[in-house]
Amino acid sequence: MFGFVSDLLTAAVSSLDELLQDTPAHQIILGTAALYFLYNQYHNPSISRWYRSRNNASMKQRIIDSAYALAKNLPGVNQIIEKELNKELSSTREKLRIQRSGMTLREEIPEEGLSPQDILSAFDVDVEKCHFDFLSVTNDSPEREFLVERGDGKDSGALYAIHPKELTELLKEVYGATALTNPLHDKWPRINAMQAEVIRWCQNLFHGSKECYGLLTHGGTTSIIEAMAAYVIRARAKGIDYPEIVVPETAHAAFKKAAELTGAILITVPVDKKTGAVNPKVMSSYITRNTAVIVGSAPSFMNGIHDPVSELGQLAKKKNVPFHVDACLGGFLTAFLDTSSEPMDFRVPGVTSISADLHKYGCCPKGTSVCLFSEDSPALSVYAALNWSGGLYATPGILDGSTSGARVAEVYATLSYYGKNKYQEIAKSIITLRNAIQKELTTLLEEGNGLTSEDIYVYGNPQWSILGFRSNTCNAHFIADELEKRGWKLNLLQNPDGFHLCLTHVHTLVKGFETQFIKDLREAVIDVKNYPPGKKPSGNVKVYGAVGMMPIELQREICKQYQKARLNYTSASPGSLRIFTNVPVEEDEGLRNRKTEKYKV
């Protein structure tokens, strides 16, 4: 038997030699490598996982990353990169220094407790900025003008509500009464019942059944992570070693974070270039036996465009996969509008979970969101460790253990105070303002005024609170930069370049908001069109342009250093940020000065 096999192999090798005798060596090597790669693509899970995850990066990005991986090992390259990055980040350090100038900062907790007056003085700067946030502002109130003067009327999606003074005082009392309670324990039955009430209210808003399950979380990112973790854990329990989360390319970055934290693979699906929404037929081609969940946005953060939830629900049912609707941004806006013709919640068969932020259009204190699961959801976000030596340990949610009951109580108080009718009034006023802005822009472009729809236009067909702007003749980031000079603080977008304006209740209180915005937008576009050829970008525009030509590793390092600077107050001092630990830097003068308990930045 072995002799027969040996003869067969010898004959096969001989035939292969004859077949390839005139073939150049490099072709044989490349062909062998290609066959080996293709084999592993389908039969080696680790290679398949690497390939599918890498496939999410553009070819341009992969080339940049590969070139950097080779170049960074060359002598002196790290030092050059370090030097250039510090030049680019110098403006960030300067902004931090200016923001914190005049603040009295401490190195340690005080030895003796401070008086309430001394403690409150530490908040003076931010309290002054929020002073008018706590007034009862009506359409005829003179305080409306202050919103513009303080810049609140020109921030995109930063301040979602202006609480009446009465509600602010109520929230103070509620927090003081409940700050030390903990919903994880049954010692506070009213807090526990209140949490169940809040979750039930939200389930009803999104048309869930009484058997729905829900969590009150710290924010949209947490809600998304809870849902994704539940589905990934379920997939692994089914024997799927490398679960995949399939999302539109416009899905929030929190899904990428969730994939990295759970060890799942994030599969991004291209959206339609005209509509900005994902095509269910295209998404279908990305679903495999490893798919843990598919995702749709309602709406997306970038351009405020919602994916076709009903069609995606049908796809989920057909493919027998869970379907998560991310309504973190607009959930508590659309819930109070008539969406019966195009539902985006549990009315859609196939929807198994929804994430929605209370701290946006729900007007609740920051750090509040919900993650809801349908009655038919195959997975729930629950954690249990029943063999722990400390006893039975179980939490409603995978991430949180103990939390303050004040969060529950403040959400309960806010929702109760506003009521459905007020939320409906707010939602309608925001949509009315969005329509007014679009009408003003249409009128501007029809009248000419030196501009056409090629110079500035709203992308897609947004129906809710976000307007995404692009230009075919100008750098959209330059336009946003000019608007910033006029006091506007907008969100820059990339791939492709653009910017968006996220409307909130605050904007509806600013008299003539739409007229002022379109006036400034027109001036900004005209200024950019008159830029001299070859004008170099600066500020945020320069940062966004550089990121597009930067390796992923450096992008993450810059973000890490920026966040480190924000969270470590000493980083506001002049000095070099260290990217590579083996690169020597000069001693930071600020470090030498931190010898006393207090100092001025």
Swiss-Prot record:
GO terms for biological process: carboxylic acid metabolic process; sphingolipid catabolic process; symbiont-mediated perturbation of host autophagy. It catalyses: sphinganine 1-phosphate = hexadecanal + phosphoethanolamine. Keywords: Lyase, Pyridoxal phosphate. Its EC number is 4.1.2.27. The keyword Transit peptide does not apply. It holds the Pfam family Pyridoxal_deC. One of its GO terms (molecular function) is pyridoxal phosphate binding. SUPFAM superfamilies: PLP-dependent transferases. Its cofactor is pyridoxal 5'-phosphate. The modification N6-(pyridoxal phosphate)lysine is found at K360. It comes from the Bacteria. Belongs to the group II decarboxylase family. Sphingosine-1-phosphate lyase subfamily. PANTHER family: PTHR42735, SPHINGOSINE-1-PHOSPHATE LYASE 1 (PTHR42735:SF6). Cleaves phosphorylated sphingoid bases (PSBs), such as sphingosine-1-phosphate, into fatty aldehydes and phosphoethanolamine. Possibly implicated in influencing the macrophage autophagy pathway. This is Probable sphingosine-1-phosphate lyase.
